[in-house]
Amino acid sequence: MTAIRDNLCELKRLEIPRPKCQGMQFVATRGRQGFYRTIRENGAMYGIQLKPQGPKRPQLSSDLFNRPMTVPEENSEDVEEAQTSQPETRKVEMNNNNNYKISYTSRPPLPPQQPKQTYTLQRTTPQAQPTPQQPRMFSRSSGGITGAVNNRPQMVAQQREIAQK
């Protein structure tokens, strides 16, 4: 039994054999797989080609952050000039990372202004009820909820009908 234990204790870290390519330098990383540092430069000699990887998500244009936070007020003359001017022209530039840069030479035209409609609210006075309300009968009792149930308007009306007969 001690022979097996001694053999197990002598085991070292298992190394995964790496292919040895002449001209390629292997770089070990934390994980089990490393990478070859020179594969991009010298890979074409060995029939290996790596495509350049672009950004994972589209990059925001920097002018979003450089704009002033306040909107300048415009005169009505500026608005009319913008409406009568020619439509905008834009210049598109493409750089090597397939990102597009668009620069506007003029402002886009503003939509035509619509006349504002004003609405007036007419107040109506509530009409008087044609039938006068009958006075309610209140009786003092310490009946609690029973007294409240007995003094409901329906009960009072039934009691009046009985009293009138």
UniProtKB/Swiss-Prot annotation:
Q: Where is the composition biased (Polar residues)?
A: 94-106, 139-157
- Tell me the superkingdom of the source: Eukaryota
Note down the stretches annotated as region Disordered. Answer: 49-165
UniProt lists compositionally biased (Low complexity) regions at 120-135
Q: What is this protein called?
A: Uncharacterized protein AH9.3
What species does this protein belong to?
Caenorhabditis elegans
